[in-house]
Regions:
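Acidic, serine/proline-rich low-complexity intrinsically disordered regions
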Residues: 142-366
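Short, amphipathic alpha-helical interaction segments embedded in low-complexity terminal/linker regions
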Residues: 1-224, 242, 358-366
Length: 366
């Protein structure tokens, strides 16, 4: 017969100690520090901050260390910590047009005001393992350059000529939704959709964005502009009556320029898709911009026929913490449910063999 296995508090405590032992690894190898994770695994830190909805490099590095490099577990840890923090208010919207740019490219124009700035990128590497990294040592110092001049957004250039739709503006008096405080409901406004996409699993968004390029809700995208750098964050101090700078954060912004749109009353123009994420997160912001544009199908009176255009499908399945919890709950005891299924199956098999006039096979579990 089936016997339920009971772990108990002692077994769980032993499992936690074993986890700590495995996390530390070989004691003869130096323990990795939080600054090492933050500085040398910076893209992983950026993803944890973005999908954890908390800009704190040290905390993200700690979460990665505690999670043994499992980024989804690290995101879960960061979100759990975030839930304990007090809310002092909302900052002013950041102005990415004033960004101190470290990287900025456009696939729509070769020559743009401010120029193309490659910055730190894997794009032109050969994707070959570098054995010199295993030996350690300092890399060659990067070339120095003059401070970058002003860089207007490519979409602003198109907008001056009326070639792209105006950036959709929210009602200034309307409250901004908050997915972390209120349950998701449909249909969702764009502010909630963008919040959801910013917190969404990068792999999920990448797959959906890829699906749009393969014809499932195709919107014929161009990477109008991708920029990465520092922007200043300001908080409106009501007592002082003006915005107070809090510091600077690193952001990646992607503006997708998409297929023409027009009607009997409106001239054809390009449409937009938007992505924004903490740190250097180009793959995430590009995928986000592709999916954002697809989710605007209802707004733009387009036929909804692809998964990436279905906001309920996308937004209900994009959260990796929620998805992990639902999938991994299958590891928890389901003894009663299984016994019920097992009893029903045995009854059905007995009826089947009785009707067939055959002897049932002896149950191996007995």
């Amino acid at each position: 017969m089936y016997v339920a296995v009971k772990g108990g508090e002692r077994a769980i405590g032993n499992a936690h100690r074993l986890l700590a032992h495995e996390r530390r690894g070989d004691r003869d190898v130096a323990e990795i520090s939080l600054p090492q994770i933050s500085e040398q695994l910076s893209l992983g830190v950026d993803r944890v901050m973005t999908e954890g909805s908390l800009y704190d490099r040290e905390l993200a590095a700690l979460a990665i260390k505690q999670a043994r490099g499992d980024l989804i577990e690290a995101i879960f840890l960061v979100r759990a910590f975030r839930a304990t923090l007090p809310r002092l208010g909302a900052t002013e919207p950041v102005d990415t047009g004033t960004m101190q740019v470290r990287r900025r490219i456009s696939s729509t124009f070769k020559d743009i005001p401010g120029g193309q700035v490659l910055g730190p990128t894997f794009d032109y590497t050969h994707r070959l393992l570098d054995p010199q990294l295993a030996e350690g040592g300092a890399p060659e110092a990067p070339a120095t350059a003059e401070p970058l001049a002003g860089m207007p957004r490519v979409t602003d250039i198109l907008g001056r000529d009326g070639l792209i739709e105006p950036s959709p503006l929210a009602d200034a008096d309307a409250p901004v939704g908050d997915l972390t405080r209120e349950p998701l409901s449909f249909p969702a406004d764009r502010d909630l959709r963008l919040q959801n996409l910013a917190r969404a699993d990068e792999g999920f968004l990448l797959a959906l964005g890829y699906s749009t390029q393969r014809g499932y809700g195709r919107s014929h995208p161009f990477a109008g502009e991708i920029r990465f750098g520092e922007v200043e964050v300001e908080f409106l101090a009501e007592d002082a009556g003006f915005a107070v700078p809090l510091g600077a954060i690193e952001l990646t912004e992607c503006q997708m320029v998409n297929q023409f749109k027009g009607s009997a009353t409106e001239a054809p123009c390009f449409t937009r898709g938007y992505g924004l994420a903490f740190g250097q997160s180009e793959r995430k912001t590009m995928s986000m911009a592709l999916v954002d544009r697809s989710l605007r199908a209802r707004e733009l009176a387009e036929e909804i026929k692809a998964p990436a255009q279905d906001e309920e499908f996308v937004m209900s399945h994009s959260d990796n913490v929620q998805a992990t919890g639902f999938v991994e709950h299958l590891k928890l005891p389901h003894y009663v449910d299984f016994q019920s299924e097992l009893g029903l199956l045995r009854k059905l098999r007995a009826e089947f063999f009785a009707a067939a006039g055959a002897e049932p096979l002896k149950e191996a579990a007995e």
